[in-house]
Structures are given as C-alpha cells and as structure tokens.
Amino acid sequence: MRRRVVITGMGAITPIGLNVADFWENIKKGVHGIGPITYFDTTDYKAKLAAEVKGFDAKQYMDPKSARRMEQFSQFAVAATKEAIEDAKLDMSK
C-alpha cells in the first residue's frame, strides 16, 4: 500500500541550529557543529569530539517539571515538534 505524505511544517534542534532558520543558515555557511565533548569528562574515552547541541533551554518549550522528567532527546523532540506545529500554522485546539 502506498501512502502520500505532506510536510506542512518543519522544526529542528541540532548542533548547528536550535531552529530551522539557524540550522539552514549554518548549513549554507558550511558549519559542521563538531567540537570537543563538553557534557562529560572524556579522559577515559578514546572519542574526544562530538556534535553536541549547545544553548538549548528546555524551559522555553515546556514547564520545568516536564523538562525534569524527560531525557534530553525527548526535550529536543518536543521542541522541534512545537516549532513544526507553529511553522505549519496548525490550530491544535480543533
């Protein structure tokens, strides 16, 4: 069975942009987002580089209690989804 998919809105939380506009601008500039790992001590690890998402504040997208209960990857998903809903101009109350 084939289904058609329609993209109505976009959202992004990435190492090179915390929204679609910044992400796209940085792609055009050739920014890669890779740098030294800062989230934990890498002394005992061979890997020293990563593409970390920096400057993300979950409280901009959800209440502090919800943010505390979620892993960071889930916070990213919620934030990107909210941006996509706004971009699509969807009225979620309907």
Language-model segments: which ranges?
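Conserved "HGTGT" condensation-loop signature of ketosynthase/thiolase-family condensing enzymes
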Residues: 1-94
